[in-house]
């Protein structure tokens, strides 16, 4: 069914794809930067991950045998599990047939065939629209947008079609089996068009879920939950962690519940909230605060941005009386604003200091000035110290 729908929709799509090839020059630029060169990401990431140290999760034995994987390998494992379990599942996007820019789909075309893992034109709107059509037939559509920065041409398809399909049909039809994957966040050399964190744009859109993992173990479990969820999901993958993050990951499929934040370190004085790569930054901040100030920090990984876990965050703030939220995206209109607003409504009388947001600047993402742009541990530590002294 999925293959028939793919071929039928593909014929119409290919006729209109010519105007969408605007990124050929950018692809060449990406080659020069090292995105597509074998090992290119390794060199860049080893050179530029000084703003954080990856903290692996403790090995979990409850899901059976584990294997050492980096983040992109855990993504591959999740996709492999999905294709093996669900004969209707298909994976498609730019260059996914040869393994993708970051190698997340490597080997899957050879294993499952060209009708289930295939390339698309350079047309994000078409990729997502195509995925909606696949999902409406009842098949499982796993679409890849090559970089989160290029998801915006597909904004109309995501916001006005995928998110509203079930609602506008009175639940007669839905495209809930659509999952959109996209590499996300800073990478050390991505500059304006390969570094953005656009989660807040989609947080304002009822009908979709937005998920961002912090580690290989989390990535596999959360991605499998997204793929099997009954709602369209956007799964943003921190690309700086593709190779920098390595830990033991179960070989067999397992799921981590969506919309459940995780308290990864308990504390009593300050609540620190982040997601994706920034979780590792605030974990370092928590250690610095304990060592230098004697301050006990509770660290929360939000994991699901929409719908987010209000109860876990508010319960923590009621205990600590202070909240610091950090993300790479710009400050104004960032998702930290939504968390801050909700917490002050729910926990106002418990707050001991103003809520602090430590985020990217309200500028385009810079290239050589990336180290000054990102909300590193020193910026977070300074903000925490101000809260303590308030």
From Swiss-Prot:
This protein's UniProt keywords: Acetylation, Lipid metabolism, Metal-binding, Mitochondrion, Oxidoreductase, Potassium, Transit peptide
UniProt cross-references to Pfam families, sorted A to Z: Transket_pyr, Transketolase_C
Record: residues binding K(+): 176, 178-179, 226, 229, 231
Keyword Transit peptide: yes
Transit peptide: 1-48
BP GO terms, sorted: amino acid catabolic process; branched-chain amino acid catabolic process; lipid metabolic process
Functional note: Together with BCKDHA forms the heterotetrameric E1 subunit of the mitochondrial branched-chain alpha-ketoacid dehydrogenase (BCKD) complex. The BCKD complex catalyzes the multi-step oxidative decarboxylation of alpha-ketoacids derived from the branched-chain amino-acids valine, leucine and isoleucine producing CO2 and acyl-CoA which is subsequently utilized to produce energy. The E1 subunit catalyzes the first step with the decarboxylation of the alpha-ketoacid forming an enzyme-product intermediate.
Self-association and partners: Heterotetramer of 2 alpha/BCKDHA and 2 beta chains/BCKDHB that forms the branched-chain alpha-keto acid decarboxylase (E1) component of the BCKD complex. The branched-chain alpha-ketoacid dehydrogenase is a large complex composed of three major building blocks E1, E2 and E3. It is organized around E2, a 24-meric cubic core composed of DBT, to which are associated 6 to 12 copies of E1, and approximately 6 copies of the dehydrogenase E3, a DLD dimer.
Protein name: 2-oxoisovalerate dehydrogenase subunit beta, mitochondrial
Lineage: Eukaryota, Metazoa, Chordata, Craniata, Vertebrata
Gene (name only): Bckdhb
